[in-house]
């Protein structure tokens, strides 16, 4: 969910197509976070980790576009790695969404 919040901050600081693209990316991350919360039965509970506040990366908050891109690329790379690590633990038949999410995050990181 940190990635969703980070992209929302970036969307708020951009105009036009940049704002739309960042908002779309935020929505993707928020939807995945919701799906995970529901799949693990923590949605709406006191155990839902999305209830926490996040320390956003300094580069994202600096207003420097290059620093924000570096921080967002790092977040996306860490997500790609986390999704890939979960593939090995996933039950057969449930790996495809993890692979899709990992590849998507890796592409997003590379595009930054």
Tell where the protein language model's regions lie, with residue ranges.
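All-alpha RGS (Regulator of G-protein Signaling) helical domain and cognate RGS-like helical scaffolds
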Residues: 1-112
